[in-house]
Regions:
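C-terminal domain-boundary segment and adjacent tail
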Residues: 96-100
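Acidic, low-complexity central loop/insert segments
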Residues: 78, 82-95
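A translation/RNA-centric and nucleic-acid-associated enzymatic feature enriched
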Residues: 1-42, 46-81, 106-207
Length: 207
């Protein structure tokens, strides 16, 4: 599918294409998410899609710019229901909060750790510190991918839930703790298999 607009998630790069029949750039869809949300807004029931999607800057032994994505939506499901739904598709899983994973592996609280603390935990040299700068979420992503996820069991799933609100993407913040998002990711070993969240439907919060 082609769109005149790129995806709004800052963590995802849209693949740009051009057509002689259309002024300006077009973008291949990164997921069927926005079309499916239109269907939900039009009162469709539970829905799913299995489709080819495209993402730029996703090239390596674990990522390709084109891949097949399963995406589904359940009405009136909370975060726990969505986690159970995802896990039942694959296998049994260990569920851990994002903050607890950091505390367990690094003895760092992701909500309060300083950039200095995180760079020390990453054994970051001066070049890496300069490259990442002072963006907290970039440091947290580095910690997750290089220090925490490699500790996950390789023979079962690990579900990490309640990511920081700054990494909510299109998820709502947790009703009982606004510092975290109702969002999760599923890993086997250190490889992410999927993710999910409770939709943000509050227009004021989304703005």
């Amino acid at each position: 599918a082609l769109s005149r607009s790129a995806v709004s998630d800052v963590q995802i790069e849209s693949l740009e294409v051009r057509s002689g029949q259309c002024p300006g750039p077009l973008y291949l869809h990164t997921s069927p998410e926005f079309m499916m949300k239109r269907m939900l807004a039009d009162s469709w029931p539970d829905i799913y899609s299995i489709s080819r999607v495209f993402r730029d800057d996703e090239w390596g032994p674990r990522h390709q710019p084109e891949f097949t994505l399963l995406e589904w939506y359940r009405l009136d499901f909370g975060l726990g229901d969505i986690v159970d739904d995802a896990v039942r598709l694959i296998a049994t899983a260990l569920v851990v909060d994002y903050r607890d994973a950091f505390l367990s592996v690094l003895a760092l609280d992701p909500a309060s750790a300083s950039i200095r603390d995180m760079s020390a935990a990453a054994n970051a040299d001066a070049d890496l510190v300069a490259a990442i700068g002072t963006e907290r979420d970039d440091w947290l992503d580095l910690m997750m991918s290089t220090r925490i996820a490699p500790q996950f069991a390789k023979d079962c799933l690990t579900v990490v839930r309640h990511y920081p609100a700054s990494q909510a993407a299109l998820a709502r913040t947790c009703p009982v703790d606004a510092s975290v998002a109702d969002r999760f990711e599923v890993f086997i070993g250190d490889m992410e298999l999927g993710n999910g969240y409770v939709e943000l439907t509050d227009a004021e919060e989304q703005s």
